[in-house]
Swiss-Prot record:
PANTHER family: 60S RIBOSOMAL PROTEIN L35/50S RIBOSOMAL PROTEIN L29, LARGE RIBOSOMAL SUBUNIT PROTEIN UL29C
Protein keywords: Ribonucleoprotein, Ribosomal protein
GO cellular component terms attached to this protein's record: cytosolic large ribosomal subunit
Entry keyword Metal-binding: no
InterPro entries: Ribosomal_protein_uL29, Ribosomal_uL29, Ribosomal_uL29_sf
Entry-linked Pfam families: Ribosomal_L29
GO biological process: translation
Family to which this protein belongs: Belongs to the universal ribosomal protein uL29 family.
GO MF annotation terms: structural constituent of ribosome
Stated name of the protein: Large ribosomal subunit protein uL29
Length: 68
């Protein structure tokens, strides 16, 4: 997922995406703890995607506040 795709989404869609990423991150950490995770890089990818979503949510909130 890239930032361009995220900028096109609404804040509600971004919050939903963030919730999904948090669930995914939790499941990946659980799999790693039990030794079932084949690709540990997935944890890093999920964490960074969540950070991207949070950043864009904050940017949208700041621009909405500035325009008011």
């Amino acid at each position: 997922m890239n930032a361009k795709e995220l900028h096109d989404k609404t804040p509600d869609q971004l919050r939903e995406e963030l919730a999904n990423l948090k669930k995914t991150s939790f499941n990946l950490r659980f799999q790693q703890a039990t030794g079932q995770l084949e690709n540990p890089a997935q944890i890093r990818k999920a964490r960074r995607d969540a950070a991207r979503v949070k950043t864009i949510l904050n940017q949208k909130a700041a621009s909405a506040a500035a325009s008011e």
